[in-house]
Regions:
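Short, surface-exposed interaction patches in beta-rich subdomains
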Residues: 80, 111-183
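Residue-level detector of beta-strand structural context in well-folded domains
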Residues: 11-12, 22, 51, 88, ...
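Beta-sandwich interaction modules
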Residues: 13-14, 90-91, 159-160
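Flexible glycine-/small-residue-rich
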Residues: 26, 64, 94, 104, ...
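Short linear S-[DN]-x-LW-Φ motif typified by the pepsin-like aspartic protease active-site region
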Residues: 2-65, 111-113, 129-132, 176-183
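Structural motif
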Residues: 27, 54-58, 105, 124, ...
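Short solvent-exposed loop/turn micro-motifs enriched in small/polar/acidic residues
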Residues: 17, 45-46, 83, 95, ...
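Non-cytosolic head/periplasmic domains of membrane-anchored proteins
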Residues: 70-132
Length: 183
């Protein structure tokens, strides 16, 4: 058994302070933002990948510790039989999020049950899903994937009212973008 597969996987509540904005900058994690009963950030993954988390001026900031970017890979484990992709779950009881910024290299991003009025999501490899956007405009682009808006395939890009004050901008290199919104 290699060292990576024998490392302890932890489940930990990192913070429970109140916030209305989210800023995430990680290199390797699945990110999920959802409605919950409390303000909190949950982490599940290898202890050494535990992110730095703080709340400043009601903005939740989640980032790799000490700015170190960790590549979740192993040359001898090409099919990822032993890898554990960290899961960061951000919960808030309010149904509205003032702003969201996520920059993640490898991992999925899911925003579920939270109204997102504006923000920026930049992902290199995996899928992005925002299920309840209240933005005034959209600028969505993927290099290798599809953009789906309210169940309709829009090809590899979608733009609507992208000069508005509250715009949701999503850029993905390899993966699909799925957004639902009213109106």
């Amino acid at each position: 058994m290699n060292k990576a597969s024998s490392e302890q996987v932890v489940q930990k509540v990192i913070t429970n302070r109140k916030f209305n904005q989210v800023k995430v900058d990680t290199s390797n994690a699945n990110i999920k933002v959802k409605q919950g009963n409390h303000y909190r950030v949950l982490f599940e993954g290898r202890h050494k990948l535990l992110p730095k988390v703080e709340v400043k001026n009601k903005q939740l900031i989640v980032e790799d510790k000490d700015g170190i970017k960790v590549v979740n890979g192993n040359l001898f484990d090409l099919f990822k039989k032993h890898s554990v992709v960290p899961q960061i779950t951000i919960e808030l009881p309010d149904e509205k999020l003032k702003n969201i910024e996520i920059d993640d290299s490898n991992g999925s991003v899911t925003v579920q049950g939270i109204a997102v009025s504006q923000g920026e999501i930049d992902l290199s490899n995996d899928n992005i899903m925002v299920d309840h956007s209240t933005a005034d405009g959209y600028d969505l682009d993927t290099s290798n994937g599809h953009v789906e808006i309210n169940g309709s395939n829009k090809g590899d890009s979608y733009s609507k009212n992208d000069k508005a004050r509250r715009v949701l901008s999503i850029d993905n290199s390899n993966g699909d973008i799925t957004v639902s919104y009213g109106g």
